[in-house]
């Protein structure tokens, strides 16, 4: 069986800490896949100061999509609801697609905080491969697309108060949408991070990352209605955090 066939097999969903423990039972560390801001080692280290073994890898059977509303952009003052430029990034299964990612290890003790920080996502255990095609022998966690229904039932336990705690103060009633656009500061950051990883990662990000319509690539978006994004500087207080 080829590496790509192994890699595109149905990934295992990790619903809670016990699922993480079952998959990552050996050793004190858990592998994480970065595909957006975590393409930046600086960003990754700001979130996981004690991470180890930061490296570039390939993940078959997935694409990137700007299709989820992120409260953090509202909190940091960089969301633009009037133009719908409020989206963060997810990875979603897509046969025949490939994305360049980063992989690194975090301490298992960091998993509960990781789950809370990325609470809107579906966590999948995936098998990346090296850039020369050698399949990893251990899985990594990927933050994948979820649904509003799954978030409400699984993460919020069907409790509207929990949903409102996460999203209500920003008047967000739907997380997963196909009619929103990338947060400009965040998109610029991700592109710079990919560029810092080299030409292969840069071109992969431009051509295998899509708007919510799942047909417009980021390369096409930057050449049309998204033009000018790369020339815009982040607010002074966020220049380090969103500087690529």
Predicted regions and their residues:
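Glycine-aromatic micro-motifs
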Residues: 2-244
């Amino acid at each position: 069986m080829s590496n790509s066939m192994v890699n595109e097999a149905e990934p295992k969903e990790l619903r809670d800490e016990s699922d993480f423990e079952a998959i990552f039972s050996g050793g004190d560390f858990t592998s994480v896949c970065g595909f957006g801001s975590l393409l930046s080692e600086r960003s990754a280290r700001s979130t996981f100061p004690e991470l180890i073994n930061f490296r570039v890898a390939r993940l078959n059977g997935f694409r990137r999509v700007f299709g989820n509303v992120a409260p953090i952009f509202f909190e940091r003052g960089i969301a633009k609801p009037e133009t719908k430029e409020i989206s963060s990034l997810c990875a979603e299964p897509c046969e025949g697609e490939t994305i360049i990612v980063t992989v690194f290890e975090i301490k298992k003790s960091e998993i509960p905080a990781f789950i809370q920080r990325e609470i809107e996502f579906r966590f999948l255990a995936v098998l990346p491969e090296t850039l020369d095609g050698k399949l990893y022998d251990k899985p990594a966690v990927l933050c994948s697309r979820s649904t509003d229904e799954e978030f409400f039932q699984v993460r919020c336990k069907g409790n509207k108060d929990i949903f409102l705690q996460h999203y209500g103060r920003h008047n967000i009633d739907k997380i997963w949408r196909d009619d929103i656009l990338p947060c400009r500061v965040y998109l610029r950051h991700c592109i710079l991070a990919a560029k810092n990883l080299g030409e292969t990662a840069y071109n992969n990000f431009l051509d295998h990352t899509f708007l919510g319509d799942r047909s417009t690539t980021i390369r096409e978006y930057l050449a049309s209605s998204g033009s000018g994004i790369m020339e815009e500087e982040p607010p002074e207080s966020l220049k380090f955090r969103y500087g690529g």
